């Protein structure tokens, strides 16, 4: 579940809605029913594909449901979107990490793509956004990544700010004669 969320950027409801018939193993594609009932075919990368195979062969209980991800007890009930979120939170807790929501994995994929040089339209295509505005939300400013690109303010020394730097900056005369 985590790999499907993190590598494909699916929403938790899309993961919950995956059925066995949605996976075309021959073509390496996944059919996803997205927001608004839109049906889209996505490539299935090797890593999440192998994780799904491992779940289907070693983890998923025998059951009649066609849902890919099911409960263990009671056996074979389709997981809800809320249960997908719970799986993410529980995995974080077991790993000793701060709890995050399933949607944070979608954000992380977008951030990783942008850091690797993908354009906003490319990220939007992977996330299946209809609007560029939706994708722009994922392009939050990354201070750490931007710091090496920014030129220092004239007269400032590299490194951490001095404790009284703010006070000194207030004493500087304003351009245009104001002080």
Model-inferred region functions:
Residues 5-26, 120-122:
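Short, charged phosphate-coordinating catalytic segments
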Residues 4-5, 18, 112-116, 126, ...:
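Short alpha-helical segment immediately N-terminal to, or the first helix within
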């Amino acid at each position: 579940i985590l790999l499907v969320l993190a590598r494909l950027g699916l929403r938790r409801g899309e993961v919950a809605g995956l059925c066995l018939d949605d996976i075309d193993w021959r073509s390496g594609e996944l059919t996803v029913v997205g927001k608004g009932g839109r049906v889209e075919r996505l490539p299935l990368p090797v890593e999440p594909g192998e994780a799904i195979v491992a779940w289907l062969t070693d983890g998923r209980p025998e059951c009649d449901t066609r849902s890919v991800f099911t409960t263990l007890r009671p056996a074979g009930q389709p997981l809800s979107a809320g249960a997908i979120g719970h799986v993410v939170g529980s995995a974080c807790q077991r790993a000793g990490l701060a709890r995050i929501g399933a949607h944070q994995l979608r954000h992380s994929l977008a951030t990783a793509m942008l850091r690797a040089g993908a354009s906003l339209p490319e990220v939007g295509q992977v996330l299946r956004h209809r609007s560029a505005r939706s994708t722009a939300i994922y392009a939050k400013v990354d201070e750490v990544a931007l710091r090496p690109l920014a030129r220092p303010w004239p007269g400032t020394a590299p490194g951490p700010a001095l404790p009284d730097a703010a006070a000194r900056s207030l004493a500087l005369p304003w351009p245009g004669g104001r002080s």
